[in-house]
C-alpha cells in the first residue's frame, strides 16, 4: 500500500518549518514520513495536489513567493504526481454519485485525491481528516507536522 499526500499535509508543513530553508524542510518531511506512513511505503501526491500547491505559489505575495516556490518545487521533485486515469475517473464518478445520493458534500479536489488513491489501492495522508471521512471506501492516515 502507498500513501497519497493531500495539500493539507504541505500547508501544515509550511507552517511548521517557516524558519527552515526548503532543503531542511524536505529533510523534516522525510524524517516524519518514515515514522508516520512507514519508511518502506510508496508516497506520492495527486496531480490536483500539484496544481493546488502551484496555485499557492502564484497567489503568494512577492515577499513570500520565492520561499514558497522553492518549497513547492522540492515537494514536486520528491513526490511525483500519481496519474489520474480512466480507473480513477470511474472511482471518482462513483464516489461523487454516492455522496450526492446521501446528501453529503466533499470538495471536488478532495474527491479527485480520494479517487486517485482508491484506484491505486492506496490511502490518503492528510492533516485534515474531516475532508475525507465521508468517503466510506477510503483508507486515511492523519499526518501532522505541527502537533
Locate the predicted segments by residue.
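A generic structural signal for short hydrophobic patches within well-formed alpha-helices
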Residues: 10, 50-53, 89, 132
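Short, well-structured N-terminal submotif of metal-dependent ribonuclease cores
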Residues: 1-45, 57-74, 147
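Active-site phosphate/pyrophosphate-handling residues
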Residues: 8, 70, 90, 111-112, ...
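Substrate-recognition element of Asp-dependent hydrolases with the DxDx(T/V) motif
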Residues: 45-48, 127
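Active-site neighborhoods of divalent-metal-dependent phosphate/nucleic-acid chemistry enzymes
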Residues: 55-58, 66, 78-125
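Acidic active-site catalytic centers that drive phospho-/nucleotidyl reactions
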Residues: 6, 12, 52, 110, ...
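Acidic, PIN/NYN-like endoribonuclease modules and their adjacent C-terminal/linker elements
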Residues: 1, 114-147
Amino acid at each position: 500500500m502507498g500513501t497519497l499526500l493531500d495539500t493539507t499535509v504541505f500547508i501544515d508543513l509550511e507552517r511548521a518549518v517557516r524558519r527552515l530553508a526548503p532543503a531542511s524542510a524536505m529533510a523534516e518531511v522525510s524524517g516524519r514520513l518514515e515514522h508516520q506512513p512507514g519508511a518502506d511505503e510508496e508516497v506520492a501526491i495527486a496531480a490536483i495536489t500539484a496544481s493546488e500547491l502551484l496555485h499557492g505559489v502564484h497567489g503568494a505575495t512577492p515577499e513570500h513567493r520565492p520561499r514558497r516556490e522553492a518549497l513547492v518545487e522540492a515537494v514536486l521533485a520528491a513526490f511525483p504526481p500519481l496519474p489520474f486515469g480512466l480507473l480513477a475517473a470511474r472511482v471518482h464518478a462513483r464516489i461523487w454519485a454516492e455522496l450526492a445520493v446521501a446528501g453529503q458534500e466533499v470538495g471536488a479536489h478532495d474527491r479527485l485525491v480520494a479517487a486517485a488513491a482508491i484506484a491505486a489501492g492506496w490511502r490518503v495522508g492528510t492533516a485534515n481528516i474531516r475532508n475525507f471521512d465521508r468517503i466510506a471506501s477510503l483508507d486515511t492516515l492523519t499526518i501532522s507536522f505541527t502537533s
